[in-house]
C-alpha cells in the first residue's frame, strides 16, 4: 500500500492506493502500515525565513538590487561572463564581513555567469561556511536560469523556504515513523524528504501539480483526495538545467553527457532506485543574441521507487 497525503487545512487528507485503486478515508493507524508516503503540498502560503542575499557582480541602480523582503542583501565585486571570462576578482573579504555581521543563517548566493562557471559562487559558499558554520546556503547555479534576476529570485525563494520545508519534513517523519516519505514536485514526479529539505523550490506547487495529475484519473472526487492520489502515483524525478558552451558537435555531445550524468545522480538523490534511473527528456536550445556556441540545456531524469 502507498499512502498519499494532501497537506491541507484544517487537517491532512489521507488516501491509500493499492494496485492503483484509491481507498479513503484512512485512519492514522492504518496509514502507518503503508510502504511509503507521498505528500502533496503547496508552499505559497507557508512562513518564510529572512534571507541574506549576496550578489556577485558589478554595481547597479537601487531599483535593480536583490529583493529579499525582511532579509538583507549586498553586492560584492566578482562574477563571470556567460562565456566564462572573469569580469572581476571575487571580493572575498566583503563576503566575509557581510556573513559575519548580517545576523542570519539562510543565505542565497547569485553570481553573474554562474550557469556557465560556478567558481565564484562556490568560493562565496566556502567563505560563508567558515564564518557561519550553521549556515544554510543556496547557490543560484543549481537552478540554471540564464537571466540573473530570474535566477536570483529563485535562489532567494529556495533559501526562504528552507526552514519551513525542514519543519514539514520533520513533522511527516514524526507522524509516520520509519516510513520513507516523498514530496511531490511542481513539475510532476516526487523527491525524497532529504531532497525536499535542500531544494524546497522544486516542490513549491507540488499540491497543484498533484491535483492536476489526480484529476485525470479521478475526475469526480474532492480536490484534496485527487491531490493525495496524484502524489501517490508519482515516481522520483529530477531536473538539471545548465548554460553550456560548445564549439562543434563533439564538444556539445560531451557536455550533454555531463548534464545527463548529473541528472541521473540527482534523481538517485531524489529517492530513485539507483539501477532504475534513466533519462526521460533532454532539450537543447541555442541562446539568441549571444556568441555562437552557447546553449541552454535541460535534462529530466526519472526512476523507480526503492
Question: What residue ranges belong to the model's regions?
Answer:
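N-terminally biased helix-coil "hinge/interface" segments that flank
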Residues: 1-306
Amino acid at each position: 500500500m502507498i499512502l498519499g497525503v494532501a497537506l491541507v487545512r484544517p487537517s491532512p487528507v489521507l488516501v491509500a492506493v493499492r494496485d492503483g485503486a484509491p481507498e479513503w478515508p484512512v485512519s492514522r493507524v492504518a496509514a502507518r502500515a503503508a510502504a511509503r508516503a507521498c505528500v502533496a503540498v503547496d508552499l505559497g502560503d507557508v512562513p518564510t525565513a529572512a534571507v541574506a542575499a549576496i550578489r556577485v557582480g558589478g554595481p547597479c541602480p537601487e531599483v535593480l538590487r536583490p529583493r529579499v523582503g525582511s532579509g538583507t542583501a549586498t553586492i560584492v565585486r566578482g562574477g563571470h561572463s556567460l562565456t566564462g571570462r572573469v569580469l572581476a576578482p571575487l571580493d572575498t573579504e566583503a563576503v566575509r564581513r557581510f556573513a559575519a555581521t548580517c545576523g542570519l543563517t539562510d543565505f542565497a548566493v547569485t553570481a553573474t555567469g554562474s550557469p556557465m562557471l560556478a567558481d565564484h559562487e562556490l568560493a562565496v559558499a566556502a567563505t560563508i561556511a567558515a564564518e557561519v558554520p550553521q549556515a544554510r546556503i543556496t547557490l543560484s547555479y543549481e537552478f540554471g536560469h540564464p537571466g540573473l534576476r530570474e535566477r536570483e529570485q529563485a535562489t532567494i525563494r529556495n533559501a526562504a523556504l528552507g526552514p519551513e520545508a525542514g519543519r514539514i519534513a520533520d513533522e511527516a517523519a514524526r507522524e509516520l515513523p520509519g516510513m520513507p516519505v516523498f514530496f511531490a514536485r511542481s513539475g510532476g514526479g516526487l523527491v525524497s524528504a532529504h531532497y525536499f529539505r535542500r531544494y524546497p523550490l522544486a516542490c513549491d506547487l507540488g499540491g497543484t501539480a498533484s491535483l492536476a495529475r489526480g484529476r485525470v484519473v479521478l475526475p469526480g472526487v474532492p480536490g484534496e483526495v485527487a491531490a493525495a492520489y496524484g502524489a501517490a502515483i508519482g515516481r522520483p524525478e529530477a531536473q538539471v538545467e545548465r548554460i553550456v558552451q560548445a564549439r562543434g558537435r563533439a564538444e556539445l555531445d560531451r557536455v550533454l553527457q555531463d548534464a545527463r550524468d548529473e541528472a541521473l545522480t540527482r534523481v538517485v538523490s531524489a529517492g530513485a532506485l539507483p539501477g532504475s534511473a534513466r533519462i526521460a527528456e533532454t532539450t537543447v536550445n541555442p541562446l539568441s543574441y549571444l556568441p555562437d556556441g552557447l546553449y541552454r540545456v535541460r535534462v529530466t531524469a526519472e526512476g523507480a521507487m526503492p
